[in-house]
Amino acid sequence: MAKAVTVKIKLVSTADTGYFYVTKKNSRTQTEKLTMRKYDPVARKHVEFKETKIK
């Protein structure tokens, strides 16, 4: 069976609230770590989220 191209990743808030999003990314085209500015409802503002592995 072939290896999956899309990988599930976890985007963790840099505001240290413990809030995270789960999303997918194409591991062949996006080799670097993903960072996004998204809304953190615990901090109640937009902060940067960084990619980590799902355990």
Curated annotation (Swiss-Prot):
GO biological process, one term: translation
Gene3D superfamilies: Ribosomal protein L33
Record GO cellular component, one term: cytosolic large ribosomal subunit
Any GO MF annotation of the entry: structural constituent of ribosome
Keywords: Ribonucleoprotein, Ribosomal protein
PROSITE patterns cross-referenced by the UniProt entry: RIBOSOMAL_L33
Homology family: Belongs to the bacterial ribosomal protein bL33 family.
HAMAP family given in the database record: Ribosomal_bL33
UniProt name for this protein: Large ribosomal subunit protein bL33
Organism: Methylobacterium radiotolerans (strain ATCC 27329 / DSM 1819 / JCM 2831 / NBRC 15690 / NCIMB 10815 / 0-1)
Gene name of the encoded protein: rpmG
